[in-house]
């Protein structure tokens, strides 16, 4: 937990090494989650990238009420669901135009 606190603090201070460490620590696990919602590795990569952008922009909102991994996982799942909804709308629009 202390390591997580230091990691979060470093990321919030803009420390690139800490940001890379956070990404490297969780990216492979989160990619697996993204793959469950995506139709391809490319889509999963897009979801992962978008999710980590949200993680880094909202990191100051993390309240230590649960694990950092759980918080990141929730962001990834929500990002993936939003991606699927957006893709479904594009698919429906494409069908309507044919």
Task: Mark where each language-model region is.
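N-terminal module of bacterial RNA polymerase sigma factors
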Residues: 1-29
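Solvent-exposed, non-membrane alpha-helical residues enriched in polar/charged side chains
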Residues: 8-9, 20, 31, 35, ...
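Sigma70-family region 2
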Residues: 12-13, 52-67, 86-88
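Short, solvent-exposed positions on alpha-helices
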Residues: 17-21, 42, 46, 70
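Amphipathic, Lys/Arg- and hydrophobic-enriched alpha-helical face
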Residues: 23-41, 58
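Structural recognition of an alpha-helix C-terminal capping motif at a helix-to-coil junction
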Residues: 32, 46-53, 57, 66-78
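Arg/Lys-rich amphipathic alpha helix in sigma70-family domain 2
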Residues: 60-63, 74-94
């Amino acid at each position: 937990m202390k390591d997580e606190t230091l990691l979060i603090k470093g990321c919030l201070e803009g420390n690139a090494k800490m940001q890379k460490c956070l990404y490297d620590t969780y990216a492979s696990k989160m990619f697996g989650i993204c793959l469950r919602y995506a139709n391809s590795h490319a889509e999963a990569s897009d979801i992962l990238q978008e999710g980590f952008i949200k993680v880094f922009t909202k990191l100051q909102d993390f309240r230590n009420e649960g694990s950092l991994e759980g918080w990141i996982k929730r962001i990834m799942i929500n990002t993936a669901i939003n991606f699927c909804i957006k893709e479904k709308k594009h698919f429906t629009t494409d069908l309507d135009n044919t």
